[in-house]
């Protein structure tokens, strides 16, 4: 939650919203007002109107990054609930173009984004070389019966062994889990 308080925006893919219905707010005592903009990459606007994110959009901003394939009626319904819907370029396979999405976020003053979930989003950002810092928290298994590995089949060693990243500080042991931070080599 402290990481959330230190960034401009939290980014998740719509699959995370559909699976977990997260709040994506900072829930540390006395820091609720530090909750960043909550950003969802959702090419077809499949986020449920009854999701926690949409329901709380007037309290903590929610921006949905979508494509021209999105249903205009759903766009209007989301906007009526206080959600900012931002159209981005689409990739050849119909997903939100990550470079365009980050450029549109930057146009709105967002420069520090925490990509919190899910596995497909993490993998796409790493493969597109759009990660400046990685905080890896590894647990001894997947979460839930349909759980995915942290980066949807892209091994964590992709970052650990990459010449593009170096570890910052020591690996921390947190019970059976471990946490390590990596930064891009400039």
Mark where each language-model region is.
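Enzymes that bind and transform nitrogen-containing heteroaromatic metabolites
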Residues: 1-186
